[in-house]
């Protein structure tokens, strides 16, 4: 019985390895190769050790399923967050090697609840909920997301792992654990990377036809899938999806 349970855990990914077995230091540096460019305000901030420490605080992140599923989640996470923090074309490697250039939205300063960190955490409610989840008072100290790299990554992974309202978690979508409801099907929200864009910024980017923001998110994702040697899957855009606020 014990051996049977262990075998089942192995198959389902619940007995998964450390995220660092997929994202090595060399891979991290290859994916985010221009993050420490002199033109990047975030130079020196986003470190491999901070990412691993944060990732290991969230069971299931990058450890769910087989190696293909795990790599696909890592590619999707860094694809979305690289768009949120992009510095554009910083080298001959092109625009999809320019992620993690910024920490603060518009390089702002001060204590407001503007976008910070890899996911550009925004709004007092998100700062409050994220802070409760990771054990930090981010309402009274929101700039901790821009000054402590581990906290910064933790807020991004918290957002990634957490369902809110009628939105599934990004994690459940990319790992195949989300089943669209009738309302989702009616809104053309099908499993794939495009729904994750809808979760993150659907009100601005989705259901409006082809646009450069969604193209940029897909471009980052495709680059990381290539580096990780994994297929990106179907339904990459949200051009024809209604956003979740429209139900």
From Swiss-Prot:
SUPFAM superfamilies: Lysozyme-like. It catalyses: Random endo-hydrolysis of N-acetyl-beta-D-glucosaminide (1->4)-beta-linkages in chitin and chitodextrins. Belongs to the glycosyl hydrolase 19 family. Chitinase class II subfamily. The active site is at residue 84. The keyword Signal applies. It is found in: Secreted, Extracellular space. Its main location: secreted. Defense against chitin-containing fungal pathogens. Keywords: Carbohydrate metabolism, Chitin degradation, Disulfide bond, Glycosidase, Hydrolase, Pathogenesis-related protein, Plant defense, Polysaccharide degradation, Secreted, Signal. Residues 1-16 form the signal peptide. It comes from Solanum lycopersicum (Tomato). GO terms for cellular component: extracellular region. Its EC number is 3.2.1.14. The keyword Signal applies. This is Acidic 27 kDa endochitinase. GO terms for molecular function: chitinase activity; endochitinase activity. It comes from the Eukaryota. GO terms for biological process: cell wall macromolecule catabolic process; chitin catabolic process; defense response to fungus; polysaccharide catabolic process. It is an enzyme of class 3 (hydrolase). Induction: By fungal infection. Disulfide bonds join 206-238.
């Amino acid at each position: 019985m014990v051996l049977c349970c262990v075998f089942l855990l192995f198959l389902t990914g619940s007995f998964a390895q450390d995220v660092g077995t997929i994202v090595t230091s060399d891979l991290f540096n290859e994916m985010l190769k221009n993050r420490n460019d002199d033109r990047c305000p975030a130079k020196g901030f986003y470190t491999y050790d901070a990412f691993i420490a944060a990732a290991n605080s969230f069971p299931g992140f990058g450890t769910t399923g087989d190696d293909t599923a795990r790599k696909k989640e890592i590619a999707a996470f860094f694809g979305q967050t690289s768009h949120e923090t992009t510095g554009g074309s910083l080298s001959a490697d092109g625009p999809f090697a320019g992620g993690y250039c910024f920490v603060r939205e518009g390089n702002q300063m001060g204590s407001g609840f503007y976008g910070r960190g890899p996911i550009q955490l925004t709004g007092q409610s998100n700062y409050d909920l994220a802070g409760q989840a990771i054990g930090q008072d981010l309402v009274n100290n929101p700039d901790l997301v821009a000054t402590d790299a581990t906290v910064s990554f933790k807020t991004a992974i918290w957002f990634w792992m957490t369902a809110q309202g009628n939105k599934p978690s990004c994690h459940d979508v990319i790992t195949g654990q989300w089943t669209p409801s009738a309302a989702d099907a009616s809104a053309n929200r099908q499993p794939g990377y495009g729904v994750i864009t809808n979760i993150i910024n659907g009100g601005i980017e989705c259901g409006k036809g082809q646009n450069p923001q969604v193209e940029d998110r897909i471009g980052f994702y495709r680059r990381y899938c290539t580096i990780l040697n994994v297929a990106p899957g179907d339904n990459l855009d949200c051009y024809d999806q209604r956003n979740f606020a429209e139900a």
